[in-house]
Amino acid sequence: MYHKTLPYRIFSVFNYILLAVISVCCLLPLFHLLMVSLSDTAPANAGLVTFWPIGFTVEAYVKTFDNANFLASLWISVKRTVFGTALALLVNSLAAYALSKDNRVFRGRNAYLWYFVVTMLFSGGLIPGYILILRLGLINNLLALILPGLVAVYNIILLLNFFRTVPKELEEATFMDGAGHFRSFISIYLPISLPAIATIALFTMVGHWNAYFDGLIYMKGSENLPLASFMQTIIVQGNTTSFDPAVIANLSQRTLRASQIFIGALPILLVYPFLQRFFVKGIVIGAVKE
């Protein structure tokens, strides 16, 4: 039977304490934000709120959800995240499947792989990208937020390395049963690669949900902005024109901002626990080459 040595136990205790401290440091700002959003106007403006609400009220959340532009931005972000993640998983997994084959199966594979890798080092630039979106007529279109980042080379490489770990005998068995590449991809590769796919889904979801710069460039009008871009105009630029002046006069801007930030962070916080069990496994296996 394996017995843990004293140095190992001390090291483990130290690690647990360190991770606990880091976790608390990460959670405290979010918890403080929640307390500010649930506090009354006067103590929030005076900076008296720490880790317990003063004058408990949910008025900031009521006014936030009464704001039509905020709800429109929230819906745009939901659509962008759902459709953008689904399309990215489809495109990147198909590309990774093709690139995981050797040159005997996919001629020119190395050339295509280098073509993808070069895009990680050099981008097309902001102005050419805007001109392209403009010429395609995608300004104020949801596709303008999805298509430019649809192909993520890092995710393709992660999946490619994962696909290479799939035993070739499984694929050969499906071919002997009369299946083609697409059938093999659906029935063999996708189920086995669930940890890597879940990891990429999490990366893509977080990227779409938190992206704000492209919304400011490609979307015109506050009613067309995704949530991150909408909050950027309010929090960073101080633009509160989307709110009723009476709301601004009677409610602290600090509590309003805190409620919006917390609402914006909540969806990812709720999704992550369901995907985190795949996260480490997907990264480790996808990063290893044979």
Q: Which residues fall in each region the model found?
A:
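A hydrophobic, multi-pass inner-membrane permease signature
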Residues: 2-290
